[in-house]
Amino acid sequence: MINIRKKHPLMKILNESFIDLPTPCNISSWWNFGSFLGACLAIQILTGLFLAMHYTSDTTTAFSSVTHICRDVNYGWLIRYLHANGASMFFICLFLHVGRGLYYGSYTFIETWNIGILLLSAVMATAFMGYVLPWGQMSFWGATVITNLLSAILYIGSTLVEWIWGGFSVDKATLTRFFAFHFILPFIIAALAIVHLLFLHETGSNNPTGLISDADKIPFHPHYTIKDALGFLLMSLFLLSLVLFSPDLLGDPDNYSPANPLNTPPHIKPEWYFLFAYAILRSIPNKLGGVIALVLSILILAIVPFLHNANQRSMIFRPLSQCLYWALVAGLITLTWIGGQPVEHPFIIIGQVASILYFLIILILMPLASFLENKLLKW
């Protein structure tokens, strides 16, 4: 008699994806972040659903509805902070997941990689719109500054901005549509994640060596389900520690003041996970140039597979590429720090140098290092 999980049409799909899935036996903890992202998405959808039950997307009541959630709703403060810090957790896992893909050469699965870039863009759009919803000072001014960047697009820029705003400034119409998109996008992200998994299971997972591991694979369950369960436990511990001990650690104090179009904060900045891109945007004096650099800072990931010219897939045996990779990580951390600083000397020049290095390492230095490593292997 065939087991029901191998026979039932629906169970068969789940079985082939999470139970009997042939998995390389040597994948490390860096491969856990994909499942962490799934858990983060589930947390965000659930907490977001409960928040949406009490939130009102109207400029006059949005701020007070968030206050009401925290003060009057049963465990509303916990749901709100789980959602806000869950977004930070989401981005930590997302950056580590992309970083692992770059280090171990997972970008050679082009379809999976491109869907991943789409997912990254969708998550960033969702997080940006979510930041606007509490209608605090930084919500309002962040929305004004970031949406206003679209006016740099030639010919249609100004019309496009007014179309997105639904008027001549960020107001009620903007907040309502941002709430609608913020609600629907996580479900689109969930659908994209399924497509991401579909393409991944077509090729099979990569492994730290970057070598084909078809001859040495083990079932996903129980080996990796237990490993993921431990990861979920540690992730939950970290998230709950953040929520229960320092819920406002990653937020902005300005967002505890209601939005006031007549009072500009001294330093407008987005959430910490956008600061690297914001620093790249600010490092270019020209508005259009800054917007192009901002978009390219994410879309540059799409051309990484075409710049790969190394004989070895993974960086595990490529010391020169490893040095450049960690220089890139250091550059991104520097950009994140600079994005949170005021626009003055010496932060301007540090941001410009870090931005140049970011593009230089990915576009020129890494392919050159790979070429040199290929030559050294033959030497």
From Swiss-Prot:
Cofactor(s) the record lists: heme b
GO molecular function, one term: ubiquinol-cytochrome-c reductase activity
Pfam families xref list: Cytochrom_B_C, Cytochrome_B
Cited SUPFAM superfamilies: a domain/subunit of cytochrome bc1 complex (Ubiquinol-cytochrome c reductase), Transmembrane di-heme cytochromes
Membrane topology annotation: Multi-pass membrane protein
Coarse class of the protein's main subcellular location: mitochondrion
4Fe-4S keyword on record: no
Binding site residues for heme b b562: 83, 182
Note: Heme 1 (or BL or b562) is low-potential and absorbs at about 562 nm, and heme 2 (or BH or b566) is high-potential and absorbs at about 566 nm.
Physiological role: Component of the ubiquinol-cytochrome c reductase complex (complex III or cytochrome b-c1 complex) that is part of the mitochondrial respiratory chain. The b-c1 complex mediates electron transfer from ubiquinol to cytochrome c. Contributes to the generation of a proton gradient across the mitochondrial membrane that is then used for ATP synthesis.
Protein name: Cytochrome b
